[in-house]
Swiss-Prot record:
Effect of residue 761 to M/Q: No effect on catalytic activity. No effect on virulence in mouse host. No effect on microneme secretion. Reduces sensitivity to antiparasitic inhibitor compound 1
Key words of the record: ATP-binding, Cell membrane, cGMP, cGMP-binding, Cytoplasm, Kinase, Lipoprotein, Magnesium, Membrane, Metal-binding, Myristate, Nucleotide-binding, Palmitate, Serine/threonine-protein kinase, Transferase
Names of the cofactor(s): Mg(2+)
Stored SMART domains: cNMP, S_TKc
Top-rank taxon, per record: Eukaryota
Name of the protein in question: cGMP-dependent protein kinase
Cell wall biogenesis/degradation among keywords: no
Known function: Serine/threonine protein kinase which acts as a downstream effector of the second messenger cGMP. Plays an essential role in tachyzoite invasion of and egress from host cells. During invasion of host cells, regulates the apico-basal flux of F-actin probably via Ca(2+)-mediated activation of CDPK1. In tachyzoites, required for microneme secretion. Required for tachyzoite gliding motility.
Recorded consequence of changing residue 635 to A: 77% reduction in catalytic activity. 87% reduction in catalytic activity. Complete loss of catalytic activity
Length: 994
């Protein structure tokens, strides 16, 4: 509950029933109380190859790496294996999750993203001689009580104040820069940085001097500095016992660069004199943020200058910008060579390059110039050699990577042209999005030479009814009759260029003969809609019937009562409507009578009357009587025809109940009942406490007038202020108030008083998904499909509104009384505007780009899908499951190998996990321009019915028996002393919206 700030979400019980692991939720604002890393020098990070990290924001895998990567595989991954030694030798993994104390060292893992075909034969891989044995049976076990972290204010400034006494001025020499740069490059957190970023951080390093016995860091105190030893020796003490000694070039404290945590050891100067280079976390992350933001903005601007991409949408341009790779070229180094195969587009970011053909210089390229655009479309050899004249920096993207993040570029460009033309059409603007997509996909693309007669009225056999100009220019002539000669003549009606379309009149009148003459001016490319394509897409030749259907659907989708029906339920309901006509003055419904029908006005006007007094009028596409479908109650008003004739679409309650029934009907009744109830704080009666958290308690309350039960989250204003979480709480309320999805907890309203803020939400009684998967053991494919698909739909809803959830894990998902999921706890959520840089979430579920600090987008949530699916089907967590501290968790996420237990043999599931747990966010499945469509259409979901899930037509894996709530035996994890004098009234009215 509340913002994600260093709460210890739970002590997790392994599904092998005996072992647990602590998982903490982290944010920059407060210390999570996790172990530090003073005992690990930089050498520990040297094991990780720099090239194995996700390169973010223009500093990713080199072009060569991208070229070598097989289709569908993250460039920094090895080729995927299969589920056991006999099938290819993927290392097995134990199903264990131990506490932070006394764990084994983490295994080396490597995240992989496989090709679309998971059943393809993989190359052999080395198999450990003693592969760890997985569990013989499906694990299970009871959950241990959650362990709450002790929260306190962010006092990391204490270390900074102490270090100020040792701060000294030193102008860095070339040797100093070399020492710092080498150490930073070997550091885990910095290993993904480019040369410019390393240089900027080296400049930001401060110089500190110490004498023998001086304390640099103290065990148990919050730390915010990362250090590199310049000279002297320093001892490492744990519990006042010397465990290590460090000298020149060694580094320590790298976890402090990621987030605010307590030091795990004391470091003391042991030589007569010693000196350190140090950088504070805020300086480090702010430097990366500024460099990353500037780099993205520059690359985006360069991309905008490429006319080749001008027909792309802003979202598509952003996707390409994220995928751009930075390449450096020395003077005289060829960038491309004449005659070589070309498949990369280059944009000069700085420097200049010479273009030559056959050894003869043609021209000079400078900043902002680009070349190789045809290489993205056609497999043509390079027509010229381009050589760097001076040190030159380029950003580039290859055809293979572009296909993965955007799709076939030519197809995308043509699709954009068609979408824009259809959106401007008065005919097609009434079509549904899925209908337009089907039309576009079914379009036939053809090339025509110059002066070619494409269509003539006699060419009826072609069946062409509508076309777009994708490239080139053509003329359209209309046939008219000469009054004098009575002969037909052709008269120029229009000249069409790229992006323009023709044929609306033939779409509206499918049987009307084509009566135009169409001829190309020069070579051109057209996209054609034939009569058969239109018929197949519209479901028949009657376009009026299709538009009628679309109108009903658009109206019904806006109504709360019908908003989340499945497509099948929606279609059945619309087909059940009948048209009824009423004459002026005729009563349609009467006040006080039992309602059994729902009406939508097709044409005309009706008057709403109460006690024979007119309240208002309703017109075309307005509706009334919808609650009669759910409730057997008297009509509260009369409705009569107010125009000469009123045509209504009508559906009866009996028909509705045949279409909408069972869990969906019960869900609708509950949601409508909750929406109708006006709740006042004084009408709430506390029944019991159902949970406790960082900022207070969650209580089960009863609304006395209606007997409806709710959950009331009581947030201590004192705690919020003490932890500087005012903005987080405001944002949490704002996001929750906007959410309206069946798989997301519903906020009813908020209250406040002097001591507390209150969130009144629907009551969710089925317990946590975390507990459910422990009861079920390892999930079968159908069970994992159900839960992952439900989570995907909830997060997709948020992402459509540009909201990043940022703390996705089974503990933050509850089950309702039917066993369907409810996403809760929006304390970490953020409305995204550009990129985010804050380290927030639960370490085991964090995406690599969140840890690295160079900016992330909505893609971070998609990584968590992979972690959850792995947990569902494999048992342990994919990364850091056996880690001793958070630094090891982060190291495993950034550099570890993804391996699967021998008992996981579902190749579709393995493939999806690999593609979700891809360290390159732009290549991660679900993160390309296709979005969640790629996830939904993955082979793992090939036999899954998404529509039935939305309509509550699938049986949940676990049907709750009775009511289950979080244990309420623990005390609040944040307690202020009685004499605490925190002022409750802030300088600004931060809680005014409650």
């Amino acid at each position: 509950m509340g913002a994600c700030i260093s709460k210890n979400s739970s002590a997790r019980v392994s599904r092998s029933s005996a072992l647990s692991a602590s998982k903490q939720t982290v944010a920059a604002s407060a210390p999570p109380g996790a172990a530090g890393d003073e005992t690990s020098a930089t050498g520990a990070a040297e094991e990780a190859s720099r090239n194995s990290l996700a390169r973010v924001d223009g500093t990713r895998a080199s072009a060569a790496e991208l070229e070598r990567a097989p289709d569908g595989v993250c460039p920094d991954r090895e080729e995927p294996g299969t589920a056991n030694a006999e099938q290819g030798g993927v290392t097995e993994k134990k199903d264990t999750r131990e506490t932070l104390a006394g764990m084994n060292s983490p295994k080396t893992l490597e995240a992989e993203a496989q090709e679309d075909d998971p059943k393809r034969e993989a190359p052999n891989q080395d198999v450990p001689s003693e592969a760890p044995e997985g569990p013989k049976e499906k694990p299970g076990g009871d959950r241990k009580p959650a362990q709450k972290a002790i929260l306190k204010q962010d006092d990391s400034h204490t270390e900074e104040e102490k270090l100020n006494a040792h701060l000294a001025y030193r102008e860095k020499t070339p040797a100093d820069f070399a020492l710092i740069q080498d150490s930073l490059k070997a550091n885990l957190v910095c290993s993904s940085l480019n040369e410019g970023e390393i240089d900027a951080l080296a400049v930001a390093m401060q110089f500190f001097t110490f004498k023998k016995g001086d304390v640099v860091t103290k065990q148990g105190e919050p730390g915010s500095y990362f250090f590199i030893i310049h000279s002297g020796t320093f001892d490492v003490l744990v519990n006042d016992k010397r465990v290590n000694a460090m000298d020149k070039g060694k580094a320590f404290g790298e976890i402090a660069l990621i987030h605010n945590t307590e030091r795990s050891a004391t470091v003391v100067a042991s030589s007569t004199e010693g000196a350190l280079w140090g950088v504070q976390r805020h300086t480090f992350r702010e430097t990366l943020k500024q460099l990353s933001s500037r780099n993205f903005a520059e690359n985006r601007q360069f991309l905008a200058s490429v006319k080749f991409f001008e027909m792309l949408t802003e979202a598509q341009k952003n996707v390409i910008t994220n995928a751009l790779v930075v390449e450096n070229f020395k003077p005289g180094q060829p960038i491309v060579k004449e005659g070589d195969a070309g498949d990369v587009l280059y944009i000069l970011k700085s420097g200049k390059a010479k273009v030559s053909i056959g050894g003869r210089e043609i021209r000079m390229l400078r900043k902002g110039d680009y070349f190789g655009e045809r290489a993205l479309l056609y497999k043509e050899p390079r027509s010229a050699t381009i050589t760097a004249e001076e040190f030159t920096v380029c950003v580039s993207i290859g055809r293979e990577l572009l296909d993965r993040v955007l799709g076939n570029l030519q197809h995308v460009l043509f699709r954009n042209i068609m979408v824009e033309a259809l959106q401007q059409s008065k005919v097609y603007e009434l079509f549904q999005g899925d209908q337009l997509s089907k039309l576009i996909e079914a379009a036939v693309v053809k090339d025509y030479g110059a002066d070619y007669v494409i269509l003539d009225k006699e060419n009826k056999t072609k069946g062409i009814r509508f076309f777009f100009v994708l490239e080139g220019e053509l003329s359209v002539y209309a046939y008219t009759q000469n009054p004098a000669t009575k002969e037909e003549e052709r008269k120029l009606a229009a000249t069409l260029k790229r992006g323009q379309a023709f044929g609306e009149e033939y779409v509206l009148n499918p049987t009307r003969p084509f009566n135009h003459y169409v001829k190309s001016v020069g070579p051109c490319k057209l996209a054609l809609f034939t009569s058969s394509v239109l018929t197949a897409t519209l479901g028949g030749e009657d376009i009026d019937e299709t538009l009628d259907f679309n109108n009903k659907r658009a109206i019904i989708r806006k109504m709360y009562i019908f908003r989340y029906l499945s497509d099948h339920q929606m279609t059945m309901l619309i087909k059940a409507f009948k048209t009824v006509r009423y004459m002026s003055g005729e009563y349609i419904i009467k006040e006080g009578e039992r309602g059994t029908r729902f009406f939508i006005i097709k044409a005309g006007e009706v008057a709403i009357l109460k006690n024979n007094k007119r309240l208002r009028t309703l017109g075309r596409h307005d509706y009334f009587g919808e609650r009669a479908l759910l409730y057997d109650k008297p009509r509260t008003a009369s409705v009569c025809a107010n125009s000469a004739g009123v045509d209504l679409w009508v559906v009866d309650k009996s028909v509705f109940n045949e279409i909408i029934k069972g869990p969906m009907l019960a869900h609708l009744e509950e949601r409508i009942r909750m929406q109708d109830t006006k709740v006042e704080f004084q009408d709430l009666q506390v029944v019991r406490v159902v949970g406790r958290g960082t900022f207070g308690t969650v209580k089960l309350v009863r609304h006395v007038p209606t007997d409806i039960r709710y959950a009331l989250k009581c947030v201590s204003r004192r705690s919020v202020i003490a932890l500087s979480q005012q903005q987080h709480i405001r944002l949490e309320r704002e996001i929750m108030a906007e959410n309206d999805h069946p798989f997301i907890i519903r906020l009813v309203r908020t209250f406040r008083d002097k001591e507390f803020l209150y969130f009144l939400t629907e009551l969710v009684t089925g317990g946590e998904l975390y507990d459910a998967i422990r009861k079920l053991g390892l999930l079968a494919r159908s069970q994992a499909q159900f839960y992952l698909a439900s989570i995907v739909l909830a997060i997709e809803y948020l992402h459509e509104r540009n909201i990043a959830y940022r703390d996705l894990k089974p503990e933050n998902i509850l089950l309702d009384s039917q066993g369907y999921v409810k996403l809760i706890d929006f304390g970490c959520a953020k409305k995204m505007q550009g990129r985010a840089y804050t380290l927030v979430g639960t370490p085991h579920y964090m995406a690599p780009e969140v840890i690295l600090g160079k900016g992330y987008t909505l893609t971070a949530d998609t990584w968590a899908f992979g972690v959850c699916l792995y947990e569902f089907m494999c048992g342990p967590l994919p990364f850091g499951n056996d880690a001793e501290d958070q630094l090891e968790i982060f190291r495993d996420i950034l550099t570890g190998k993804l391996v699967f237990p021998h008992y996981v043999t579902d190749q579709d599931a393995i493939n999806l996990m690999k593609r979700l747990l891809c360290r390159l966010p732009e290549v991660r499945i679900g993160c390309s321009i296709n979005g969640y469509k790629d996830i939904k259409e993955h082979a793992f979901f090939g036999d899954f019915d998404w529509d039935k899930l939305a309509g509550r037509g699938l049986p949940p894996p676990l049907a709750p028996k009775g009511e289950t709530y979080a244990e309420d035996t623990e005390q609040s994890s944040f307690e202020l002393d009685e004499d605490d004098t925190i002022v409750l009234e802030d300088e600004y009215d931060w809680d005014k919206d409650f």
